[in-house]
């Protein structure tokens, strides 16, 4: 396992973008996962944020997160397409080769599997000219897709070369999804793995998962699922995953 494939996420740090970049470099990491908020919220503007990232010398693992894209229609869908285009352009400017898209939580979104696949197929096609991959993640409180086997089914149905999965240990443990389901996934279609833990054994409702994710998520080794995190990483390594971790 190559330690250069590990890098932190800016949403885990306080302070300015420049301070986060400096801290990551000082800790010996070579890459960083960026939040769009770090870029658009920079006090000197988006171009200054992009320049700071480039000057840091850190490789950008990916950009997060496109929310509530799939399953909408009409003006809502058109709006989300515009948001996706803007985020893809931001990825391109930052040198990020992966855009993280999480499963929809919108009450307006349909759960029709065919439409979900069509929408993600469209998103992947938008990313092709910029040579960006889409990593689709099952949020544990997603409205229709909340476990990674469901996300994998949608990705398979969409059948685009640049559309794959993001696997997040928090969401997997929050829904108590068995790791055995990883055996059904093609390791080449896993584009990103995110590692974190939380402070208790289970979360019993979507609301509980949201609260836990926002206020009680901790680094691997600091929560109550340390053995499961290690098992998760070993399983990924065993199935041939050689991509990035954040």
Predicted regions and their residues:
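N-terminal pre-domain/capping segments
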Residues: 1-97, 128, 164, 190, ...
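Short, contiguous strand/loop micro-motifs
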Residues: 6-8, 35-37, 73-75, 109-111, ...
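Short, conserved clusters of charged catalytic residues that mark active-site
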Residues: 16-19, 44, 118, 149, ...
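Active-site acidic/histidine proton-transfer and metal-coordination neighborhood
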Residues: 18, 70-165, 174, 242
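Short, hinge-like loop/turn segments at secondary-structure boundaries
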Residues: 24-25, 49-52, 78-81, 117, ...
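Acidic/histidine-rich catalytic cores of soluble enzymes
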Residues: 32, 63, 122-222, 226
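A short, acidic, amphipathic alpha-helical segment used as a generic capping/interface helix at domain edges
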Residues: 223-238
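Short acidic/histidine-rich active-site segments
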Residues: 244-246
């Amino acid at each position: 396992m190559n330690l250069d494939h590990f890098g932190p996420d800016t949403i885990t740090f306080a302070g300015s973008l420049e301070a986060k970049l400096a801290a990551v470099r000082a800790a010996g990491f070579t890459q960083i996962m960026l939040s769009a908020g770090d870029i658009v919220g920079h006090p000197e503007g988006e171009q200054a944020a992009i320049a700071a990232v480039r000057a840091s010398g850190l490789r950008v693992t990916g950009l997060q997160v496109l929310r509530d894209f799939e399953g909408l229609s009409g003006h809502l869908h058109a709006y989300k397409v515009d948001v996706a285009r803007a985020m893809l352009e931001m990825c391109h400017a930052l040198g990020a080769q992966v855009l993280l898209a999480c499963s929809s939580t919108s009450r307006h979104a349909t759960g029709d599997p065919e439409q979900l696949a069509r929408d993600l197929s469209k998103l992947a096609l938008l990313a092709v000219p910029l040579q960006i991959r889409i990593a689709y993640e099952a949020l544990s409180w997603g409205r229709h897709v909340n476990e990674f086997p469901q996300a994998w089914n949608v990705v398979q149905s969409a059948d685009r070369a640049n559309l794959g999965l993001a696997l997040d240990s928090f969401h997997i443990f929050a829904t108590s999804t068995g790791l055995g389901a990883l055996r059904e996934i093609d390791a080449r279609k896993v584009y990103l793995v995110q590692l974190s833990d939380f402070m208790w054994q289970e979360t019993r409702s979507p609301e509980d998962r949201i609260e836990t994710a926002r206020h009680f998520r901790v680094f691997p080794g600091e929560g109550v699922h340390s053995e499961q995190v290690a098992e998760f990483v070993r399983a990924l390594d065993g199935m041939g995953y050689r991509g990035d971790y954040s």
